[in-house]
């Protein structure tokens, strides 16, 4: 993984999004609904649903909200959302990959286009930046929650089928093949680890530093994309901040 670390930036963005918690719950409800509708309402038999529920819990989403989304899918609701991706460049030439879940493609396309153009970015064609990212399973163990040292964690990760381990002062970050993600996650939980985060994500193969004079624009672009009700995830190839 060439030293790319996500955890510090993830924590920063989660803290910044506390004020937007209601919108986050709305987006998670949409994901839960679609996962339950396509794969069934039982998380034990639906790995995708289980993963989204875990994600919802890590964002402190109330249990009642989770149950309502599942019951809505069980009740035969006719709501349908399309999965769409958008690609482009942020100020400074930083690649951006956006995942959306929408019931109105025109509205979403307009929102994304405006976010890029108003904040110094440029929306690209399909495939323009996707090849710069790899789909990976991503798991985090907060070091304060385990007595295991790096050697022990590495051994357990390899035994579980993980691909890579990165260690920082705060966390163990584990990367997996997407197809092995659920098995690795379950094995680590069985080994007694408490997971701070576990999700499928997009990891840039290479990163680009954001120029100092473009940083504010870059942050505004990401915020504008995340503010869209239809945008589920925003991935960038920005270099990690020190």
Swiss-Prot record:
<dbReference type="InterPro" id="IPR002876">
    <property type="entry name" value="Transcrip_reg_TACO1-like"/>
</dbReference>
<dbReference type="GO" id="GO:0003677">
    <property type="term" value="F:DNA binding"/>
</dbReference>
<keyword id="KW-0963">Cytoplasm</keyword>
<dbReference type="InterPro" id="IPR048300">
    <property type="entry name" value="TACO1_YebC-like_2nd/3rd_dom"/>
</dbReference>
<protein>
    <recommendedName>
        <fullName>Probable transcriptional regulatory protein lhv_0777</fullName>
    </recommendedName>
</protein>
<dbReference type="GO" id="GO:0006355">
    <property type="term" value="P:regulation of DNA-templated transcription"/>
</dbReference>
<dbReference type="InterPro" id="IPR017856">
    <property type="entry name" value="Integrase-like_N"/>
</dbReference>
<dbReference type="Pfam" id="PF20772">
    <property type="entry name" value="TACO1_YebC_N"/>
</dbReference>
<comment type="similarity">
    <text>Belongs to the TACO1 family.</text>
</comment>
<dbReference type="InterPro" id="IPR026564">
    <property type="entry name" value="Transcrip_reg_TACO1-like_dom3"/>
</dbReference>
<keyword id="KW-0804">Transcription</keyword>
<keyword id="KW-0238">DNA-binding</keyword>
<dbReference type="Pfam" id="PF01709">
    <property type="entry name" value="Transcrip_reg"/>
</dbReference>
<keyword id="KW-0805">Transcription regulation</keyword>
<dbReference type="InterPro" id="IPR049083">
    <property type="entry name" value="TACO1_YebC_N"/>
</dbReference>
<dbReference type="InterPro" id="IPR029072">
    <property type="entry name" value="YebC-like"/>
</dbReference>
<feature type="region of interest" description="Disordered">
    <location>
        <begin position="1"/>
        <end position="22"/>
    </location>
</feature>
<dbReference type="GO" id="GO:0005829">
    <property type="term" value="C:cytosol"/>
</dbReference>
